[in-house]
Amino acid sequence: MRVVILGSGVVGVTSAWYLSQAGHDVTVIDRESGPAQETSAANAGQISPGYAAPWAAPGVPLKAIKWMFQRHAPLAVRLDGTPFQLKWMWQMLRNCDTRHYMENKGRMVRLAEYSRDCLKTLRAATGIEYEGRQGGTLQLFRTAQQYENATRDIAVLEDAGVPYQLLEASRLAEVEPALAEVAHKLTGGLRLPNDETGDCQLFTQRLARMAEQAGVTFRFNTPVEKLLYENDQIYGVKCADEIIKADAYVMAFGSYSTAMLKGIVDIPVYPLKGYSLTIPIVEPDGAPVSTILDETYKIAITRFDKRIRVGGMAEIVGFNTDLLQPHRETLEMVVRDLFPRGGHIEQATFWTGLRPMTPDGTPVVGRTRYKNLWLNTGHGTLGWTMACGSGQLLSDILSGRTPAIPYDDLSVARYRSDFTPTRPQRLHSAHN
């Protein structure tokens, strides 16, 4: 089958890889000059299934009001003047109760755990290297309340069979030795030993090269004007003076998917702006061994080979990509506070990107009402974490194979009022 994939970020490229491996003739179209040039370029570097959780959580509405008056707030909202933004925020608020949070986090963890397993299989099969580490993730708590609140997330981890360790502050240095110098600032941490890290852009570029060698065609510097449709199917992609035709079409345009699908499929994917710093390492012993997540500021600090990646923040501001100095100062503040000897901050590269977020935090993967149009978008801050699993899942569904995990509650159909998902089965249980 001829398949056109729109988008060459990590989600688009993994989709191309798995569809190609399934025997399809795949073409990837992107306006950029190469893969992973936008949202996948400089994310936090975490592959953290256990921390897969929606921003829509109990208490967030009140916290958002408080954050409005804080200098280093993890979330900021600025109206962009569109009704869509207001509708999206209202849908997000409706998911900020315990029932929705547990349901959304459960399916996010399900897909993310599967994705991590798919990445392991891919790595073993291809030998792909991307400055990856398999050292786990450590979520750091600065208050006693945060430590106590971890029990809510632990319940989801146990239900999904995700191994974990709840550590007191005195034990954090066993996992991240450099934290011994700042343990007095912390109350404890939640460690997920099976989590991984890696350079998402490097992975995407190298996998794209492998995919091309396997027969995938990449059409870079090719802006897409619109999808052409009639009745219940898509019949082409209009690019300037050319119409590119295929048997099936996959939308993986990230935050730009919503506009491209206007009038065709209504999906609630909105850009969530994030920032990162990439810092050269000065003292390896003063840098993280793997990756940490600061629960207070929602900022991740990740070790690559010779660099530290500091990523976080969430701005609901539309498609604005201005680099704002106050957010750089927040990233600098957190990394100085936790790893003061780790990197040369003055030489850091400052970056921003737009993560495609749904109101419930779960991506949109699967079929649409158009028989040859498929979606793989809306992964929010977890595109790197969920990319391989989403790509394999999409390939299985499109190819008529039975996927390894339940998937009906990942489709756009879940936003219908009459939607009733099949309850996923518990896979296993293990923790320490």
UniProtKB/Swiss-Prot annotation:
Keyword Oxidoreductase (UniProt): yes
Organism: Salmonella paratyphi C (strain RKS4594)
Reactions performed catalytically: a D-alpha-amino acid + A + H2O = a 2-oxocarboxylate + AH2 + NH4(+)
PANTHER family given in the database record: D-AMINO ACID DEHYDROGENASE, SARCOSINE DEHYDROGENASE-RELATED
Single biological process term from Gene Ontology: D-alanine catabolic process
GO cellular component: cytoplasm; plasma membrane
Designated name of the protein: D-amino acid dehydrogenase
InterPro entries, A to Z: DadA, FAD-dep_OxRdtase, FAD/NAD-bd_sf
Keyword Oxidoreductase among record annotations: yes
Annotated residues for binding of FAD: 3-17
Cofactor: FAD
Top enzyme class: oxidoreductase
Molecular functions per Gene Ontology: D-amino-acid dehydrogenase activity
Pathway in which the depicted protein is active: Amino-acid degradation; D-alanine degradation; NH(3) and pyruvate from D-alanine: step 1/1
Job of this protein: Oxidative deamination of D-amino acids.
Keywords from the UniProt entry: FAD, Flavoprotein, Oxidoreductase
Family indicated by similarity: Belongs to the DadA oxidoreductase family.
A Pfam match: DAO
Protein EC: 1.4.99.-
